[in-house]
């Protein structure tokens, strides 16, 4: 629905407030944060901000400590925080957006940017970025653009994530599979799964250990597979970037490996919704695709022999890319845009906040903060930081624009369609045709 004139005036007035406040606020912030002292100039007395995010207990504890430091630096500003698990958070945020307004500052998923920007729930941040109220000089420009919608900045990345492959190095060595490198191929990955299954290793309960989870359900991995071939998920906000033949080939590849017994059985894949419930987490598979942020859960569960490897390639071309693990946005209906953007800047750029938050949201997008915090990392967290550096040197294509509205529904539809393939209810070709028909309807609605 087109934005009303009153809605446009409201957004434009908030832009004017941000622009007018930017220079003075930015100067006051810089002085305050550099001197580690309080300054009443950067806030109005008696202001309460709301700030929400999703994540585990460790992330919650660290975030609250960083927020407490912000409050100390901004007398008169109180930040009321709330957090939940991912699913509950997404439902609540959608309800808030439909009911008149999201929190003053909200943690956002990459897949939500188009939905909430186009729906008028987020405040444009271009002036805040341009005038340095939200400082972005230490962020990669292409990565910063992942928070844009139709050319305007609506959110700023809070973490830089990348897909990878958690694998049991002892099992790989036992099967004679070399350590995966950034240029290993999908064919080599498939052969590795076959070799591991052929070992006949037994999982708890006496079942044979397979090579990996069946990632035909995983749209993120399909995207990596597509990008490695020069393709993409979306050609535009209303059009898919791949064909029925592309998806049929991918699902046939996955389906064949499952039928061979090289990857997990359908029921094991269907119930995988966490590290602990995945085939690898249950000891039924030697590897699994995952994002860097949750990767440390695998060695914590299974032991230090679990390492993080690159996603396979097509002829050496990597399809993985640096994606915002999450972003920060400001609610369009906030009554305190200056203080809200100040909180965003503080969480992204203050060294003390960086020390507190660490890598709880994956690699900090501020290069200086990331390098500073990396010096203290150990174990799995240090490994994912080194992995990101290695992949950056190998060479990755730029990240795509934020997915279009409807992408969240399509991710669910993608998994549902492949479930039918897994349970032999339809063929890869027919499932691909049905999914593309549904996707086209969703994107055009």
Which residues are covered by each model-predicted region?
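A structural signal for short loop-to-beta-strand junctions that line the ligand-binding cleft
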Residues: 103-104, 133-171, 318-320, 394-404
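Extracytoplasmic/periplasmic solute-binding protein
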Residues: 154-158, 163, 187-241, 285
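Mature extracytoplasmic/periplasmic domains
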Residues: 295-296, 331-408, 429
